[in-house]
């Protein structure tokens, strides 16, 4: 990722933000304009920006020649729509999970003057996406396809979040509900579509492709998204909070994490009893017992093995694709996440 592209990408953010806080469809005053600007700056550009930048990278690899200034702007704008979608999900997700930190700072709803206004802010973030698309893509042949794509992916993600939440309903802590297939279903819908398929699908639409012709690409990206979430589950427990920017709470939150699913597969009856008694409890002693069991079961080794096998399998799937340019797009995506630490 060149520094040039990242700084160009951030310039496009400033331009989109300026459009939104001067949107003629609403009568802004100083208070509302300042609120939206502060809310955007706090929640939208703070992450690694991988999803957004991937649209530009993918489009470049598909086009295989220098992009015009206009193409760079449009690819960046689509990338930012994904970052806006991500911000909308995270603002609401943090409230539902009662999280404390996100990207190394307090969650938006935890700020003294924000609180539950964050719910409406989430709705505002979601509504910014069609505003951006309308302003910059309305005249394009693929405009309707873009709107469809964002709506479809939002529905899939919200439905994945729903399975995640109802599987972890408070007062119904049943570890027996947790299996690899439940985990994969949550991950496929909650993470893989918006984090992996959406950026490449945006680039393909911009390039003039029909998404119905790229089901294989979708399948590979969903597989990659599953691998990414397993990494996330692993880092939640074994990653360093300073590096990942948040304190993992999957154990306390009774999450259907890959680690607990694997632990249930490998544990003997005594160890399962320990898991049932301690998983999903907020007190540090219970969390420590679960982590200790993860170490005893060598889940670090099990994860390493999974990581290497997944990488091999995904590479094989990619190499069956007829287009070398599409292969490059998929391999560059995989390269960004393989053996990541955050």
From Swiss-Prot:
Instruction: Please name the GO terms that the record assigns under molecular function.
Output: (2E,6E)-farnesyl diphosphate synthase activity; dimethylallyltranstransferase activity; metal ion binding
Record-listed isopentenyl diphosphate binding positions: 48, 51, 86, 103
What protein does this entry describe? Farnesyl diphosphate synthase 2
* Catalysed transformations (reactions): isopentenyl diphosphate + (2E)-geranyl diphosphate = (2E,6E)-farnesyl diphosphate + diphosphate; isopentenyl diphosphate + dimethylallyl diphosphate = (2E)-geranyl diphosphate + diphosphate
Q: Does the keyword Ribosomal protein apply?
A: no
Residues that bind dimethylallyl diphosphate: 102, 190-191, 229, 246, 255
This protein's domain notes: The Asp-Asp-Xaa-Xaa-Asp/Glu (DDXXD/E) motif is important for the catalytic activity, presumably through binding to Mg(2+).
Comment on bound cofactor: Binds Mg(2+) or Mn(2+).
Which family does the entry's similarity section mention? Belongs to the FPP/GGPP synthase family.
Q: Phosphoprotein among the record's keywords?
A: no
Q: Where does Mg(2+) 1 bind?
A: 93, 97
Renumbered to this chain, motif DDXXD motif spans 93-97, 232-236
The record's tissue-specificity note reads:
Expressed in shoots.
E.C. number: 2.5.1.1, 2.5.1.10
The job of this chain, per UniProt, is described as: Catalyzes the sequential condensation of isopentenyl pyrophosphate (IPP) with the allylic pyrophosphates, dimethylallyl pyrophosphate (DMAPP), and then with the resultant geranylpyrophosphate (GPP) to the ultimate product farnesyl pyrophosphate (FPP). Has a greater affinity for DMAPP versus GPP.
pH-dependence annotation: Optimum pH is 7.0-8.0.
> Biological process (GO) annotations?
farnesyl diphosphate biosynthetic process; geranyl diphosphate biosynthetic process
- Hey, which pathway is this one from? Isoprenoid biosynthesis; farnesyl diphosphate biosynthesis; farnesyl diphosphate from geranyl diphosphate and isopentenyl diphosphate: step 1/1; Isoprenoid biosynthesis; geranyl diphosphate biosynthesis; geranyl diphosphate from dimethylallyl diphosphate and isopentenyl diphosphate: step 1/1
The species this protein belongs to is Artemisia spiciformis
Q: Name the positions where Mg(2+) 2 binds.
A: 93, 97
Q: Which cofactor does it need?
A: Mg(2+); Mn(2+)
Which controlled-vocabulary keywords does the entry list? Isoprene biosynthesis, Magnesium, Metal-binding, Transferase
A cellular-component GO term for this protein: cytoplasm
Thermal behavior of activity: Optimum temperature is 40 degrees Celsius.
Q: Which residues form a coiled coil?
A: none
């Amino acid at each position: 990722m060149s520094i040039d592209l990242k700084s160009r990408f951030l310039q496009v953010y400033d331009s989109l933000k300026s459009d939104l806080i001067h949107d003629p469809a609403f009568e802004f005053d100083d208070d509302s304009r300042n609120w939206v600007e502060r809310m955007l700056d706090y929640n939208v550009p703070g992450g690694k920006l991988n999803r957004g930048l991937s649209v530009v990278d993918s489009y470049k690899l598909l086009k295989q020649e220098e992009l015009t200034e206009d193409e760079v702007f449009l690819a960046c704008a689509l990338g930012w729509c994904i970052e806006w979608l991500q911000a909308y999900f995270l603002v609401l997700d943090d409230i539902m999970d009662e999280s404390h930190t996100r990207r190394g700072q307090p969650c938006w709803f935890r700020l003294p003057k924000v609180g539950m206004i964050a719910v409406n802010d989430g709705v505002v973030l979601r509504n910014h996406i069609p505003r951006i698309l309308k302003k910059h893509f309305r005249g394009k042949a693929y405009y309707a396809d873009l709107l469809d794509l964002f709506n479809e992916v939002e529905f899939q993600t919200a439905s994945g979040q729903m399975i995640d939440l109802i599987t972890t309903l408070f007062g119904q802590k049943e570890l027996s509900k947790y299996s690899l297939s439940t985990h994969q279903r949550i991950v496929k819908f909650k993470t893989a579509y918006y984090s992996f398929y959406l950026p490449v699908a945006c680039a393909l639409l911009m390039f003039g492709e029909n998404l119905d012709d790229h089901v294989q690409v979708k399948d590979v990206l969903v597989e990659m998204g599953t691998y990414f979430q397993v990494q996330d589950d692993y880092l939640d427990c074994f990653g360093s909070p300073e590096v990942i920017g948040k304190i993992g709470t999957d154990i306390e939150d009774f999450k259907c994490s890959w680690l607990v699913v694997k632990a249930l597969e490998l544990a003997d009856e005594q160890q399962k009893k320990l898991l049932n008694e301690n998983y999903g409890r907020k007190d540090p002693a219970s969390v420590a017992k679960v982590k200790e069991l993860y170490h005893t079961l060598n889940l670090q080794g099990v994860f390493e093995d999974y990581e290497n096998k997944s990488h091999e399998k995904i590479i094989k799937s990619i190499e069956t694709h007829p287009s070398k340019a599409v292969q490059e797009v998929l391999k560059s995506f995989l390269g960004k996440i393989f053996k990541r630490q955050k």
